[in-house]
C-alpha cells in the first residue's frame, strides 16, 4: 500500500468514526416542534403596484387588472 492509498483509507475511516460518534451524541436528530416551523416557514410576500401578477391574491392591493406595457401588449399588473 502506497502513501496516497493509506491516506485515503485513514480519511475514510476517520469520516466513518466521526459519523458514528455524531449519531451517538444526537447530532443527527431531526428538528422538532417550533424549531422546524421557524426554519421552514415562508414569510408572506406580495407583489407591489405596477408589477406583473399571475393571480389577484398575490398583489399587495388584492387587485390585478390588464394594462398596456412598454411594448403596447396587454399584461396583468397589480394596481
Curated annotation (Swiss-Prot):
It is found in: Secreted. Pfam families: Omega-toxin. The record marks 52, 69 as: Critical for insecticidal activity. InterPro entries: Omega-atracotox. The keyword Flavoprotein does not apply. Keywords: Calcium channel impairing toxin, Cleavage on pair of basic residues, Disulfide bond, Ion channel impairing toxin, Knottin, Secreted, Signal, Toxin, Voltage-gated calcium channel impairing toxin. GO terms for cellular component: extracellular region. Disulfide bonds join 46-60, 53-64, 59-78. Expressed by the venom gland. One of its GO terms (biological process) is defense response. Residues 23-40 form a propeptide. Residues 1-22 form the signal peptide. GO terms for molecular function: calcium channel inhibitor activity; toxin activity. Inhibits insect, but not mammalian, voltage-gated calcium channels (Cav). The presence of a 'disulfide through disulfide knot' structurally defines this protein as a knottin. Belongs to the neurotoxin 08 (Shiva) family. 01 (omega toxin) subfamily. This is Omega-hexatoxin-Hi1e. It comes from Hadronyche infensa (Fraser island funnel-web spider).
Amino acid at each position: 500500500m502506497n502513501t496516497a492509498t493509506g491516506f485515503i483509507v485513514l480519511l475514510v475511516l476517520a469520516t466513518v468514526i466521526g459519523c458514528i460518534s455524531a449519531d451517538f451524541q444526537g447530532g443527527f436528530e431531526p428538528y422538532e416542534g417550533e424549531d422546524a416551523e421557524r426554519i421552514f416557514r415562508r414569510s408572506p410576500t406580495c407583489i407591489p403596484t405596477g408589477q406583473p401578477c399571475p393571480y389577484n391574491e398575490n398583489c399587495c392591493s388584492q387587485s390585478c387588472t390588464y394594462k398596456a406595457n412598454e411594448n403596447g401588449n396587454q399584461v396583468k399588473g397589480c394596481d
